[in-house]
Curated annotation (Swiss-Prot):
Name of the featured protein: Envelope glycoprotein E
GO cellular component: a single term: host cell junction
Residues glycosylated per entry: 47, 109, 122, 241, 291
Organism: Equine herpesvirus 1 (strain Ab4p)
Intravirion side: 426-550
Localization, UniProt: Virion membrane; Host cell membrane; Host cell junction; Host Golgi apparatus membrane
Cross-referenced InterPro entries: Herpes_glycopE_Fc (IPR003404), Ig-like_dom_sf (IPR036179), Ig-like_fold (IPR013783)
Intrachain disulfide bonds: 247-273, 256-265, 292-303
Entry keyword ATP-binding: no
Amino acid sequence: MELLAASRACIFFGLVTVLDAWGVQQVELSEGAWAMIDGRDVLTPTNTTTRVTKAWTFLETPPGCAGDISVKKVCVSHSLCEDNIIIGKHCNLLTGEHGIALAEFNVVNGSLRRTDDVYFVNGTVFPILAETRSVLQIHRATPSIAGVYTLHVSIDGMMKHSVVLLTVKKPPKQPQPRLRVKTPPPVTVPQVPVKTHTDFVVHGYHSRVYADGESFELSVNLESHIVEPSFSAEIQWYYMNTSSSSCDLFRVFETCIFHPTAMACLHPEQHTCSFTSPIRATKILHRVYGNCSDHGNSWPSRCHSTLLGNRLYFIQPAQNRVDLLFKDTPASATGLYVFVLLYNGHPEAWTYTLLSTANHFMNVLTDVTRPRLGEHFYTDLGHKIITPHPSVATTEELGAWTRHYLAFLLVIICTCAALLVALVVWGCILYIRSNRKPYEVLNPFETVYTSVPSNDPSDEVLVFERLASDSDDSFDSDSDEELEYPPPPKPAPQLPPYQFVDGGDAPSGRSGFKVWFRDTPEASPVPLHKPTLQGPDYSRVASKLKSILK
């Protein structure tokens, strides 16, 4: 078996010839062959590099001109100079050069990080533009893919090219010797249908709790049952960070593993609490197998493969090329690790394992339904949500969290300030209302008597008079002038002691006082304000009282 595999490898490499003539690679493949062509990245980013752009372009060879192509020091287009390819005089170049892949990178800490990319594939040629390598992956070569493939690399405006001339030829037919054999009589044998069924089974643990700095192996225990003579396969490992998730339950949707480009898988509801499409995760390991014919369980390590992907410094592929080895694992490696096996381009087996420290352990559940589409999702299909590597600080998430926190804090401060101002204003209003009193007009004079009091009920001579203004008087509170009151009347001269007219004692039932009136009545004080209506005249009544008392 090993001899057969070695002979096939020799035949394969014998059919593929790579010549480096003046910087141009000339690759010759046989029809139906599989190959991986290195694009030879011609520029290396420096410490001052800020932006890198890579692109693959294709210039198709016209039909019938495969034998009239040579490598010469001639330019055929503006993008191909210095070391170029020329087509003979008898062939007309009717097709134009068109792009098949484009990728943009940013430089972070001296290493490239992909920001956006786009690919145009036809099922046979798969251009790959990675951070460290740029290759062309050929599956079952056909004459239609023959032509000029150019890798363009632009670093801060400086452009370089790497050219590959690919030709595809039909394999030579080996003459078979004619053997004369007597044909036996036909024997009727019942035809039994041949079962061509391939099956893959994985037996892995769905969770593992580790300590910071621990080393261990993450195994999926892959079992394979392959009946096809040759096949192609891919082994992929994806990572999704769960350390910053506050979900009680993390869901893994199996439907999205088989349909990664569905809209509900690209933009699910509660995307931080679910693993849906692998496109939303970070690919940490990608191994490609082409034209493999080993049918045992050890086919991943026996068949020829190409390792792609940007794996982390603490992760190494295991000896069987399927499992992962973790060495001195940091706490930032917490997350969901998903294994996917593609057989002839279709997912056939998958499993997941939650690696976390004790502080970030959570429940993970496999969901076989379709996830719900998020209410606010991106309509731009070119946008990709990429989970950052666990070894790199997620500055974007930290910045978003800081902006949300500052906005929330600003709203709280503004609300508290508004409430404080409202309380101060309301307190001032209550204080002013409580201290405010209606204006009172005070009489500066006391009540005086204009006659001598008596205890005789029949004597109604006692008259009270308040030396004050009328009820109609009003004061202007806004006036700064003080009110001037007339001086009080001078006291009357002292009268001699009176005597009873009849010379006897005071009659019983009386107070013993007599009221003496002057001949000239005492003038009343001039009121401050004259009443509008003149009161009744009591002068006659007073004269009668005087005559009676005499």
